[in-house]
Amino acid sequence: MSVLVDHFDVFAGGFWLTFQLCILAATGALLVGTLVAVMRISPVPPLRWIGTAYVTVFRNSPLTIVMFFAAFGLPALGSNADFLRIPGLTSIFSRLGIDLPYFRFAVIALALYTAAFVCEAIRSGINAVPPGQAEAARAIGLTFGQNLRYVVLPQAWKSAVVPLGSVIIAMIKNSALAGFFGVIGDLSNSAQNLTSALGEPIIPVFIGVSIGFLVMTVPLGILLDRIERRRAVAAR
Amino acid sequence: MTERTEAVEVAGGTTTGEPLIRLDGVNKWFGPLHVLQDVNLSVARGEVVVVIGPSGSGKSTLCRAINRLEPINSGTITFDDRPLPAEGKALARLRSEVGMVFQSFNLFAHKTILENVTLGPVKVRKEKPAAARDRAMKLLERVGIANQAEKYPAQLSGGQQQRAAIARALAMQPKAMLFDEPTSALDPEMVGEVLDVMTSLARDGMTMVVVTHEMGFARHAANRVIFMADGQLVEDAAPDEFFANPRSERAKDFLSKILTH
Ligand SMILES: Nc1ncnc2c1ncn2[C@@H]1O[C@H](COP(=O)(O)OP(=O)(O)OP(=O)(O)O)[C@@H](O)[C@H]1O
Ligand SMILES: [Mg+2]
């Protein structure tokens, strides 16, 4: 187990990069997922179709394939995902700004894939809002967008937050794939390096990597349990 | 089918010429169910029209058609001389001019009573929040629940919630108000407080379409009573006339049922 001590900096660095990947992908997934959910319930049929098609594709494709398309398809299309080199953001998440695009590709793949599940969690939250709420909002003259923003979504979030948390936990675990698609120095890529390049023993290395993921997922899970329990008490 | 009294000469109502709400040959189907059958109705400014009829006769649908919460299949509905616009900004604007009060209150559950009342004025009418707040407090005072302003809907009694819902509708300064069985979800002891607010609105000259089974309200506050059955307007008469002398069998039958208990 000495590898955990000897290469603590590698694990810590891998954790930090995976953490950044997860923060960015989760943010993107929440934004895109909310947008797609709104499209799916919009009164405009073509928007609904696009939303439904999006969810159908991304919910039913293996993440590996989505990662593959991002890592090899985007460059083939001539994109280095430079739109993610957002000034300001790159100073916090320095990997976003570098020339090597694989971190950006991983963010995109993970965010787009997770967005389909975020969409469905939000949609179930929207469906849990009594229809009278939206109706009353329409009756006082709120437009579709205002209705969502001020009446429906704030209430939908409440019942969506626990399923959303589960989606994000799944996303954190899924982020382990990034190391196999060109991202250097995240938790899974660090593990590969330590075992194949440096010949460290496999089991302790993967225990270290597991701890890295558990540090992110377990607190989130506990938080969700808390929220759920508080809800249950409030509902009584 | 429709027997309408030409001029409206009743119950101390002040009504003027051009109708504010007008339905011409309105038909509405839910699948095979013909819920509104060739409905013609006009409601003058300042007029209070009570709609009664057996369950399932289409009263709610009629009420909801007027602000297009329920789209119709044929015919025309005009409000304030304009045909109802299709879904979109113009319809939202029209809806803001027609207050609606629901059986189940439908107050925004995540907002305080005060926020419920100011949301429309601030977001739809772009009023200054402080001004909207002042006006909202006056309205809450008017309906007698100013001291509940900071509470959430679930913390109020049914009667208080319904009065808050009326205040929310009034905050938009509507040209007309639609009420769909505003007191049927209330415990009996709270019905009076809501009817009092509605009666005072009627006195102040608000144009109102009220679906209700409160015959006392119909007698005292309405200019006209409309009796609906199976999607048709079967009778349209002054309250005194209607209650003393219903013309159709359906109406006689209905009245005998609701007035015997
Ligand atoms: N969204 C809907 N889809 C299908 N059928 C509907 C819908 N809304 C109402 N109906 C049907 O249309 C008919 C008229 O309904 P409506 O609610 O207008 O009646 P109502 O006179 O208001 O009855 P109540 O006194 O019970 O409120 C009923 O038979 C009802 O079942
Ligand atoms: Mg009804």
Name the predicted role of every residue range.
Chain A
Residues 1-236:
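Transmembrane alpha-helices and adjacent helix-loop boundaries
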